[in-house]
């Protein structure tokens, strides 16, 4: 139905509504006002009790309505960056089924964003475990497609990534770079040149060199990052091991009214007194 002007009460019906209440696990209809659930029950009863010109009616069309999900373990602050990167998830979530598909997605992203020569191209979601025939993404693949740009393709775990030559130079990684304890640097066969994934402790210097956001980007990217959660039905995000800088970013975004979901932050023990 059309949304009534100034409507603050919404009735959902026409699909499966899951309550997560053992006494009444499923209902036909649900009424919401100002972000709070007023009533659940049979469709006829709910629509009769909440009728009027100010009521918005939503027909679920046979789809399922679920309560908002709560992220119990995550790193919300990373979503601000991910929202502004090429998405290379493996199917069905994304296009990253093989190297050619990954390169095509990167090229489309760079063209859409009009990224100039010399500017970093960043992506997220690469998963080497799904690459057919063990053919993994490597430095040469990225160099061939992007000879004039540094390219950083972060792993789906966020614990590593693949860099092209220009990105390796930017982050100070070379054949002379030793693999630290607990780290992985995949090297070109027969050489010491970094070639594929850089993971765990070897990736920390890369992860820690992200460009700071401008005040405008903090607001814009906070909304974009939170939309990634909202689109997946997550209404509470979690930021684990929160250091002072990301905490301040979240605080400024909150003060600017940028939040569309709840965010729970757990301060890192070494920064607790500063916060």
Residue ranges and their predicted role:
Residues 4-13, 18, 22-275:
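Divalent metal-binding segments
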């Amino acid at each position: 139905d059309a949304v009534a002007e100034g409507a603050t009460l919404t009735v959902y019906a026409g699909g499966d509504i899951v309550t997560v209440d053992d006494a009444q696990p499923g209902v036909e209809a649900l009424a919401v006002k100002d972000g709070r659930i007023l009533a659940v029950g049979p469709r006829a009863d709910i629509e009769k009790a909440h009728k009027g010109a100010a009521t918005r009616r939503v027909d679920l069309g046979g789809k399922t309505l679920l309560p908002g999900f709560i992220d119990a373990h995550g790193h919300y602050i990373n979503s601000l960056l991910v929202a502004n990167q090429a998405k290379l998830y493996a199917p069905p979530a994304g296009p990253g089924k093989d190297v050619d598909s990954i390169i095509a997605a990167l090229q489309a992203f760079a063209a859409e964003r009009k990224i100039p020569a010399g500017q970093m191209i960043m992506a997220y979601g690469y998963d080497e475990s799904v690459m057919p025939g063990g053919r993994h993404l490597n430095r040469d693949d990225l160099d061939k497609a992007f000879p004039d740009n540094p390219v950083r393709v972060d792993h789906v775990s966020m614990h590593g990534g693949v860099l092209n030559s220009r990105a390796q130079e930017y982050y100070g990684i070379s054949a002379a770079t030793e693999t630290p304890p607990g780290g992985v640097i995949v090297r070109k066969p027969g050489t010491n040149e970094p070639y594929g994934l850089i993971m765990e402790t070897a990736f920390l210097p890369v992860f820690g060199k992200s460009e700071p956001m401008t005040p405008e980007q903090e607001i814009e990217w906070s909304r974009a990052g939170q939309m990634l959660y909202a689109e997946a039905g997550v209404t509470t995000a979690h930021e684990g091991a929160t250091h002072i800088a990301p905490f301040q970013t979240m605080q400024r975004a909150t003060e600017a009214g940028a939040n569309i979901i709840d965010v729970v932050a757990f301060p890192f023990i070494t920064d607790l007194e500063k916060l």
